Amino acid sequence: MEASEGIVLGIDIGGSHITLALVNMDTQSIIEHSYYRTYLNSRAKLEPIIDIWANAINNVFAKEQVEYKRIGMAMPGPFDYEAGISYIKDNKKYDALYGQNIKNILAHRLKIDTSQIRMFNDAACFLQGEVFAGAAKNYSKAIGITLGTGLGTAILSNGVARDANLWSSDFKDAKAEDYISSRWFAKRYFELSGINLLDVRALSDIAAESPVARAVFKEFSENLTLFIKQFIEAEQPEVVVLGGNITKAAAWYMPAVSRTLKRYGIDIPVHISDLKENAALLGAASCWQNNSKILAV
């Protein structure tokens, strides 16, 4: 077993799951046998959600002799991360958490002090994880973009990651998330084909044989390129790191993104995260290293 002094529990709260792992802060790595993931109904009432979270946390801590439990949680917003209060609503997930002090409720359920739980924005945790042990490790200024059910954005400056909150920024004739998310893929493919597909993975699976699927990926590459270009021009980073489930289909859009960025004269490296979901876990845990380097915004 690992020595407990350098161990922190990192948690990533997703729209349909909770993923957890103990992190060895000395080696900046996940303790592999501690990794745990379980699915949940984020439309459920408060108590069942907290029950699943608490049971998962206790399950993972039971795998190691950890005398003092420290928890770092990567949470979607809007959320008062310092106080621990959720303001998520009208988003078809976690509405039951709205207005509740989740930090207090969870600490009570776990029988620990609230000071043992730290909560941060999930996109900022992703980028901080990449700084802690990934593609942004040797950079002082970076931007992170998570591509999934929604659009997450974060900025790293002087070693501090913060939520950029660009999902709702003006983009084309709507908001950025309307064009850069798995929801856009489903909507656009249906508009062009009249067929409902479950997710981006399903679209990727048929892209080799489907001109319509390839057309959707081409259009997405144009949207993503424009968004990255605008983000780079605004923040002037040294590196861009992309994560999220949509990056699993990167072969169908990233070559076009890279070519077009070069045509714009942008030669900043754009990396797909090697840490994948582990980035958020590592980033959430890293908030306990020499005080937090993630702004709770």
Task: For the regions a language model picked out, list residue spans one by one.
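Short beta-strand segments
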Residues: 12, 72-76, 120, 144-150
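Charged, glycine-enriched surface loops/patches
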Residues: 259-272, 281, 293-295
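Glycine/GP-enriched mid-protein hinge/lid loop-to-helix segment characteristic of carbohydrate kinases
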Residues: 5-7, 21-23, 34-35, 45, ...
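Glycine-rich phosphate-binding loop and adjoining helix at the ATP-binding site
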Residues: 43, 47-51, 70-71, 77-139, ...
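Short, hydrophobic alpha-helical segments
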Residues: 61, 285-297
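Adenine-nucleotide phosphate-binding core of ATP-dependent small-molecule kinases
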Residues: 38-66, 175, 186-255, 269-280
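Conserved phosphate-binding loops in N-terminal lobes of ATP-dependent enzymes
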Residues: 3-5, 9-75
